[in-house]
Amino acid sequence: MAPSLFLQVSSAKVPTVSANNPLLQSYDLPPFSAIRAEHVQPAIEQILADNRVAIEGILQSQGKNPTWAGLVLAMDELNDRLGAAWSPVSHLNAVCNSAELREAYEACLPALSAYSTEMGQNRALFQAFEALANSPEAAGFDVAQKTILEHSLRDFRLSGIDLPPEQQKRYAEVQSKLSELGSKFSNQLLDATQAWTKHVTDEATLAGLTDSAKAQMAAAAQAKGLDGWLITLEFPSYYAVMTYAHDRALREEVYAAYCTRASDQGPNAGKNDNGPVMEQILDLRQELAQLLGYASFSELSLATKMAESSDQVLSFLRDLAKRSKPFAAQDLQQLKAYAAEQGCADLQSWDSGFYGEKLREQRYSVSQEALRAYFPIDKVLGGLFAIVQRLYGIEIAEQKGFDTWHPDVRLFEIKENGQHVGRFFFDLYARANKRGGAWMDGARDRRRTVDGVLQSPVANLVCNFTPADSGKPALLTHDEVTTLFHEFGHGLHHLLTRVEHAGVSGINGVAWDAVELPSQFMENWCWEPEGLALISGHYETGEPLPQDLLEKMLAAKNFQSGLMMVRQLEFSLFDFELHATHGDGRSVAQVLEGVRDEVSVMRPPAYNRFPNSFAHIFAGGYAAGYYSYKWAEVLSADAFSKFEEDGVLNAETGRAFREAILARGGSQAPMVLFVDFRGRAPSIDALLRHSGLSEDAAA
């Protein structure tokens, strides 16, 4: 739990000793194309050394009577310089992974972890922050400044500031090892994903697949110097087989390879096995929690979250499961009945996607593939920008002539009343050596520097969509459109902040179980006729989504929503239970089985090793926090219900949401911000209604 105070990821303007290392230069946007693996470690070591010297100077001048500018802003400058170098390295490691860059990245992790712990356990620094918090000056601080001091003192305690020296030393060792293991988990998953392919030479094997999916597979084969088609475990390829392939044996083969990645099972059993890595991570997290006086890592994780206790989280998840499970059982029964009609009497995990899509097509006469033609990327982006321009009063324009890490990357600028607000990069398409999934990271924070200059924010928005092929633009499925809106919601949270203090601007300082509110909130416009009118248009003719197709799509919105809900609750409960009960003698697999007994309606085969690829909790920020998606969905659904009342493109309500939620970042508790916008505490009713799981839906 590195203190947020000490590793803000941002940009910098501190002079440097090296004229040749791009990571040690001052820059507006990172010089991505100039960054080499050999630059990484020397730059990070130099900055850490410089920062240590600078902190000694800060403590000498601020030890007795600290001031905001002399202490907090001075520390911001140091954090910013470190972030300016580390952010592009971490980003490139995720989107352009290579053996050399990976080695350089990993070589820095122990030093960064040690520095973070050292800062968090620096008693003189802690005392300076404590003195500032108790000073007469602090009485006049604004709410954001007070929150930063409160978070800082909390983070010192969560870094072991109160521990005796031996335990502090052990804390540092555990944090360093956890940093290394998280990276190892991620690397082994990426390597396992890349390690399996299936070369197909008979097109009949691919019966049922769409032309676009086959074109991608042909391109993948060509890239390896092969004829025919190459199936990979990158998500667009996997999804295409599981959803459309008529060949049941092919579906089973690809499913088995995908769900056993980085495990002791499947075609590459024992290679890149994340099983031992998970056990080590769980042991160390439990040790960390106990060092800091918490019963479990779940309890420790809640120290920085909106939820008040483990019991509250578990009650919330179990209540949702109880409400959802009857709907899920009904969904599964209908799917099994349909599959049996089609000649599949024993529905298995590799059949559910295929028959689910066929049942959706039969019931609603709509398929993801038919919809794809209406969502060319530029139309979707134009509509997305039009929606947020109308809601939030901003302008978005594409920029040219910038340094990049790949030719597909695009850069956009946000302005308000002609004034620069921030910029964001889009890296939208799947490719080799790029981490799977979709994410936003804040590449630079909005903040007022020690010189009084306002630094504007920058965000990286990354997805893994199917790229353009054979002269067509990239065409998105509606699911991909929703993913784009989700990540853009995160981006707006980071970019539209009005807070000028780095510690709580944008997504900084936001409780993890509230951070998904703006992202899940944005998804709603993908399901509203007014939103769809702006983001859809046939890629050849430009004609809007036909009314009948629109109606079918909206009717199909909650198709199998019970199954989808219990699947997410399975992930959430598994994660929380795993961290709450570690050490009770149960294995990871046994915890998962227990959760499935409680909430699941369909069991995967015994060889399934889903946890081995659950990067969110083993290599991301969601450990004992995956429940945050559902927790924040209650907030986002209820917030959106205000737009349902006022009009989904109502500018006044949009401005109110911006000012209450987006503009204020982590400067106040999420519940305070929510109540400011909604006028009351959140209710679960909107989530149940939006998901088709309310009593009305059952009637």
Labelled PLM ranges:
Residues 5-9, 13-209, 643:
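N-terminal helix-rich structural modules
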Residues 466-485:
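Short pre-active-site segment immediately N-terminal to the catalytic Zn-binding motif
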Residues 9, 15, 456-458, 478:
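Alpha-helical segments
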Residues 49, 53, 57-64, 68, ...:
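Intrinsically disordered or highly flexible coil/loop and linker segments, enriched in small
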Residues 144, 148-150, 177-180, 187, ...:
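Active-site-proximal, well-structured secondary-structure segments within enzyme catalytic domains
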Residues 24-39, 89-108, 130-173, 232-276, ...:
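Short His/Asp/Glu-rich catalytic/ion-coordination signatures at enzyme active sites or charged loops
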Residues 6-9, 14-39, 46, 66, ...:
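C-terminal, non-catalytic "cap/extension" segments appended to globular domains
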Residues 80-91, 150, 154, 256, ...:
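Short, hydrophobic/amphipathic alpha-helical patches that form generic packing surfaces
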